Amino acid sequence: MRIQGIQKLTLLDYPGRTACTVFLSGCNFRCPFCHNAPLLTAADEDGMDEDELLAFLKKRQGLLDGVAVTGGEPLLRPELPQLLEKIKALGYVIKLDTNGAFPEQLEAVVRAGLADYVAMDIKNSPARYAETAGVPELALTPIFRSVSFLLRATVDYEFRTTAVAELHDDASFLKLGDWLAGAKRYYVQCFEPRETVLQAGLHAPSEMQLHCWAELVRPKIPAVEIRGI
């Protein structure tokens, strides 16, 4: 399995852990605000091979305690469970980032004990989900299933929404609060414009707006926080 990149140290990507972040290529979404756009279609021959990653992790035993696996969409990769098993065998805890579009794979990974923390991106309220994911006619049933699974599961998790001025409004967050009511934790993340973003001309909401949106959600999800300001 090819690994498209690795951030050798992060204190942010895995809450409460000293971790590295592993980037996998390929994604079924085309979110206009995606900051990892180069990973969407990266060639398999790019990056490092799996053995190189595992050798790095062996050397970092005792220095790192967690591995965050992100993309792209990691659950697109059929070889992912085998990679997670090998990382687990080295004694690491694993955080898995996902867009929730593959609930069967998500459930299998969690039930096998191959993910200790799941971070699921919630793009928007259902009415604007397809637009925000960049996929016309997107079927939402798999997304609903993944949300329902995490709300019931014993695995640690978070939901998070990257807030973009052109894509989100008060109604978005009122609906999100209803949908995700009772969630363990929820983050409103501030969009960061970068040159690699898929769609030019998008803007970050103001800090005041982010706080307003967080407060709209709080009655249904008390553990709501803002990231990126």
Predicted regions located by residue number:
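Short, charged low-complexity linear segments at domain edges
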Residues: 1-17
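Glycine-rich, highly charged phosphate/nucleotide-binding loops
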Residues: 46-56
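Short beta-strand segments
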Residues: 25, 70, 121
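Canonical Radical SAM [4Fe-4S] cluster-binding loop centered on the CxxxCxxC motif
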Residues: 14-48
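Conserved AdoMet/S-adenosylmethionine-binding subsite of the radical SAM
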Residues: 54-66, 75-206
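Low-complexity, intrinsically disordered Gly/Pro/Thr-rich segments
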Residues: 207-216
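Acidic carboxylate-rich catalytic motifs and surrounding loops in phosphoryl-/glycosyl-chemistry enzymes
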Residues: 224-229
